[in-house]
Amino acid sequence: PLNGIIGLSRILLDDKLTEQQQNYLNTINLSAVSLGHIFSDIIDLDKIDSKRIELNIQPCDFHSLLNDFYNFGTLMAEQKGLKFSLKLDDNLPNWLYLDRARLSQILWNLISNAVKFTDKGDVILRVQKMQDNQYQFSVTDTGAGIAPCELDKIFTMYYQVKDNIHRSAGSGIGLAISKNLAQLMQGDLTVESELEKGSTFYLTIIAEKAQAHDGNAEKAMQH
């Protein structure tokens, strides 16, 4: 049902709409996408405990996926009066072999956290091709920052950063699951932060270049 809501709202957003109708549909789409990723995090709790998370690796239109990240980040940021920017390397391929849903799940967690803990300024997503088949996604904010004593704890399941201003800090599972997924993608999730200045989360993954409509490319990885 959620996929139906997401798909139909995207189709309707391409129609001629009043500004109010567009705002309503953007809210519907963003809410459905957010709810879907929250469900994915909850479902993954049991899979992580039993070490049975499956990656569904398929040819992915990488630039289409990046456009989704831009749209999502912009909608999230606008709700708090923030600016969201997407900065891309010039040498990014059009298609990659990857699990689109899982990568979206990680970036949704990182972007939504960045917006949540930032009251003014910017949130920036940078995407770079590093070496060979390695790609890096960095999410930088100008928010509250994280104390040095907490940096080694934030990827622990159920841990919540101590923040007196942003008391509704979530469930404490998103970053732990995101790091687990990053490692399944032969990468990692790390963070650099400074109190009162902001944070940058670095996601690295390994992904081979793909061709459009490669029907023989579907792969599954179980860990």
Which residues fall in each region the model found?
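Helix-loop junction within the histidine kinase core
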Residues: D46-I57
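Short conserved segment of the HATPase_c
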Residues: G7, I146-Y158
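Glycine-rich ATP-binding loops of the HATPase_c
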Residues: Q186-E192
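Short acidic helix/loop segment immediately C-terminal to the autophosphorylated histidine
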Residues: L13-E19
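Short alpha-helical Gxxx[C/S/T] motif in the catalytic ATP-binding
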Residues: G174, S178
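Glycine-rich ATP-lid/hinge loop adjacent to the conserved G-boxes
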Residues: Y159-G170
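Short alpha-helical segment of the dimerization/phosphotransfer core of two-component systems
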Residues: L30-L35
